[in-house]
């Protein structure tokens, strides 16, 4: 949605940037915000992995720790891989920004991948923790709620896909 303000008088000391640059400035501000959300989502995903790993090590079934069950080991491997992929993509976008390079598509990709990883890892943590992970106040339950918002604010995952497509396809 575009907004046009015609014949609007703004005192010179109240302008941010030059006339006509407002939309660009707003979008660049969002790029930085998206990078922050990506970092937040990486932290949530990492915490969800830690919560699941602790549960896998402490909980026992059939005389052995859950960490020894192949299917649960695969879940842990997938969680770790998603966390690390999100972390590396976020760091890459941050390096571009710090170097003064364009990073719009990379920031959106980092936010998309990290927020999707956070929700997935938090969901897996709830599943691994079982009924106790679903209880209100449980760490896994809180992480799941915290993860979900990262898919929404600073632009939904669908918006991030549109930005990425514009960046890579034109």
PLM features: what roles do these ranges have?
Residues 2-8, 12, 21, 27-170:
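Alpha-helical interface subdomain recognition
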Residues 18:
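Carboxylate- and glycine-rich phosphate/diphosphate-binding segment that chelates Mg2+/Mn2+
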